């Protein structure tokens, strides 16, 4: 259900410095539930499949739609990538083709003692190097993103990251054809750091039988990377990778609920149902910071500090208990959506889970209203993971 709503991000959002959070995106005007505030195409995309994967990627190596079993074009030069159309095949540059061929020839021995993630990082670097040659202006945008690759000035950079950068730079510089641009070890480290903190995963199709979905591809979206994290976000991202329309790899950012002018707009960097300790561990390891959002402050104060929200959500499936929560916490939505803490409640974000968490099995997606077509907000909520829609029963009953 793609609808860009005529969004003009330069009029809807502005960059601001917020104490303790750094560069942030805040509402430049009042934003409405369901409003599309940003639609962005990727700066680059790359496959999430390792070179030595036992399974062949079923996706086009440019747009990452599912390939039709009979109608796809395989590169005859490297035999390593397939495309769904001549237009997608045209994106496969001679340098990238030859680099993939050479790297694949040496991959069995080169990556034998390396984790599989190292092969995916190599894919990113090849895409980044290719961007440097094909579009220097876009490469400069990539370089402007957060992530320095230096353990001294980059909290997300670890000793393991530095070792990975050294290994990959040595391997690729010895295997790949020369480029018209110079790639130094420091630049390679910086690129890997930028990928680590800015890449967004494009997921495989949702399935009830597949509780842990895999990523089909990663993309760099410069404007979207400006959004800070909050464990109770007021916006969420949608993508429609398998749609037949143009721009299928675009990321669409949509408001979950109304936000006043001047309020920071935040995304959650992972499924909202994760418990406190898992969230903190992932944020520290992947992004280099400890979250102290309103939800984390409340959960930290709990006696064990690591309540499993999945169990809480299962308990909330009881209808009487759910209605009681809606009555007690549904009066002021903004207080429980990253905007404040109700000190009188042991679980102040219950309202968010009741209204904005997808209830389908093994989904764990976030619900947001469809883009409003009139002055009134839509009463239909869409899941950003499984794509299902439902009537906003909680909002209707307010």
UniProtKB/Swiss-Prot annotation:
Q: Which UniProt keywords apply?
A: Chromatin regulator, Chromosome, Methyltransferase, Nucleus, S-adenosyl-L-methionine, Transferase
Reaction it catalyzes: L-lysyl-[histone] + S-adenosyl-L-methionine = N(6)-methyl-L-lysyl-[histone] + S-adenosyl-L-homocysteine + H(+)
SUPFAM superfamilies the UniProt entry points to: SET domain (SSF82199)
| Domain SET residue range list | 11-270
Its family remark reads: Belongs to the class V-like SAM-binding methyltransferase superfamily. Histone-lysine methyltransferase family. SET2 subfamily.
Main role?
A: Histone methyltransferase.
Identify this protein by name.
Answer: Histone-lysine N-methyltransferase ASHR2
- The species is Arabidopsis thaliana
């Amino acid at each position: 259900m793609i609808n860009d709503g005529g969004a003009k991000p330069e009029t809807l959002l502005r960059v601001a410095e917020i104490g303790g959070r750094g560069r942030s995106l805040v509402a430049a005007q009042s934003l409405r539930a369901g409003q599309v505030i940003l639609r962005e195409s990727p700066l680059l995309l790359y496959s999430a499949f390792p070179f030595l994967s036992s399974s062949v990627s079923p996706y086009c190596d440019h747009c990452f739609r599912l390939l039709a079993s009979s109608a796809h074009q395989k590169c005859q030069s490297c035999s390593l990538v397939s495309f769904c159309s001549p237009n997608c095949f045209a994106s496969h540059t001679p340098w990238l083709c030859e680099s993939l061929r050479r790297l694949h020839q040496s991959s069995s021995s080169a990556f034998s003692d390396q984790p599989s993630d190292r092969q995916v990082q190599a894919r990113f670097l090849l895409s980044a190097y290719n961007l440097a040659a094909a579009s220097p202006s876009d490469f400069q945008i990539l370089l402007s993103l957060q992530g320095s690759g230096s353990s001294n000035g980059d909290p997300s950079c670890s000793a393991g990251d530095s070792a990975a950068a050294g290994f990959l730079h040595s391997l690729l510089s010895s295997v790949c054809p020369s480029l018209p641009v110079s790639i130094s070890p420091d630049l390679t480290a910086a690129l890997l750091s930028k990928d680590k903190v800015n890449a967004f995963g494009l997921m495989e199709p949702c399935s009830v039988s597949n509780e842990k979905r895999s990523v089909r591809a990663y993309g760099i979206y410069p404007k979207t990377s400006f959004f800070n994290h909050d464990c109770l976000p007021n916006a969420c991202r949608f993508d429609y990778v398998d749609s037949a329309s143009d721009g299928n790899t675009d990321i669409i950012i949509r408001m979950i609920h109304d936000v006043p002018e001047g309020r920071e707009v935040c995304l959650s960097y992972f499924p909202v149902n994760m418990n406190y300790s898992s969230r903190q561990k992932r944020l520290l390891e992947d992004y280099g910071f400890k979250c102290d959002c309103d939800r984390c402050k409340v959960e930290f104060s709990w006696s064990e500090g690591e309540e499993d929200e999945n169990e809480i959500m299962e308990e909330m499936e009881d209808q009487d208990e759910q209605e009681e929560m809606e009555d007690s916490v549904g009066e002021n939505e903004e207080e429980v959506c990253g905007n404040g803490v109700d000190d009188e409640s042991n679980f102040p974000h219950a309202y968010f889970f009741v209204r904005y968490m997808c209830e389908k099995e093994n989904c764990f997606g976030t619900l947001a209203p469809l883009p409003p077509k009139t002055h009134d907000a839509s009463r239909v909520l869409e899941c950003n993971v499984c794509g299902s829609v439902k009537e906003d029963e909680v909002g209707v009953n307010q």
